[in-house]
Amino acid sequence: MLIIPAIDIKDGKCVRLTRGDFSQKKIYLDNPSDMAIIWRKQNAKMLHIVDLDAALTGEMVNIAAISDIVANVDIPVQVGGGIRSVDAVKSYLDIGVARVIIGSAAVTNPKLVEELMHIYRPSQIVVGIDAENGVPKIKGWLESATMQDYELALRMKEMGIERIIYTDITRDGMMQGIGYESTKRFAEKAGMKVTASGGVTNSSDLHKLEGLRRYGVDSVIVGKALYECNFPCQELWYSFEDEISIDHNFSTARQKS
């Protein structure tokens, strides 16, 4: 199971929200690139970045910060948040982002996905489905789609999408455990590669998700649980923090040259 640390960027800072509520914002670091390096030191193999400002406005105001992250780590970076055009996708891929996530636009403008799949490889474009009780939520989770989550996934599959990032928003940022049953139901019906998200609290959640591998769930995005140091191994990493540089043998990470 690939564990993907999440970095949410708001006003240029690394933050975490609770259930997507901007009024419940906690700032963890002023420089998101520093956060990326910390996760890489702890042997992250991929990073999940969300531009919260872009999600609100559609403007890529944090692209410089994201570019800095890409330049400073030697692992793939996937980016989502307010991506609504081919030009936006191109801009991210041009700075070295490995994978771009289409969210609300998959519902409001499915032709965008169709166009992107004619231009880019399936490995470069994924769709994020944020669902509540099986219904996709869009536009900052303020509106509901008129179809079920798995129905949206199957439409995307027909267009060539191979992977879905599936978030149970009732669990997101709540530290109440992964939405195991909702993720299982979705993965069974979609029949696609699935990255789970929302609610991971501790290692027991990760062990539970291992049971969903046969349904295509092969990775998980972890946010607040990592930031709140809910995993015992993090105590080891942080106890040696002053001695570990990005290119130190203690980590498999290597600084980009």
Curated annotation (Swiss-Prot):
One of its GO terms (biological process) is L-tryptophan biosynthetic process. GO terms for molecular function: 1-(5-phosphoribosyl)-5-[(5-phosphoribosylamino)methylideneamino]imidazole-4-carboxamide isomerase activity. Gene3D superfamilies: Aldolase class I (3.20.20.70). It is an enzyme of class 5 (isomerase). Its main location: cytoplasm. It is found in: Cytoplasm. InterPro entries: Aldolase_TIM, His_biosynth, HisA_bact_arch, Isoase_HisA-like, Isoase_HisA-like_bact, RibuloseP-bd_barrel. CDD domains: HisA (cd04732). Signal peptide: none annotated. Its EC number is 5.3.1.16. It holds the Pfam family His_biosynth. Pathway: Amino-acid biosynthesis; L-histidine biosynthesis; L-histidine from 5-phospho-alpha-D-ribose 1-diphosphate: step 4/9. Keywords: Amino-acid biosynthesis, Cytoplasm, Histidine biosynthesis, Isomerase. GO terms for cellular component: cytoplasm. It comes from the Bacteria. The active site is at residues 8, 130. It catalyses: 1-(5-phospho-beta-D-ribosyl)-5-[(5-phospho-beta-D-ribosylamino)methylideneamino]imidazole-4-carboxamide = 5-[(5-phospho-1-deoxy-D-ribulos-1-ylimino)methylamino]-1-(5-phospho-beta-D-ribosyl)imidazole-4-carboxamide. Belongs to the HisA/HisF family. NCBIfam families: 1-(5-phosphoribosyl)-5-[(5-phosphoribosylamino)methylideneamino]imidazole-4-carboxamide isomerase (TIGR00007). This is 1-(5-phosphoribosyl)-5-[(5-phosphoribosylamino)methylideneamino] imidazole-4-carboxamide isomerase. It comes from Chlorobium chlorochromatii (strain CaD3).
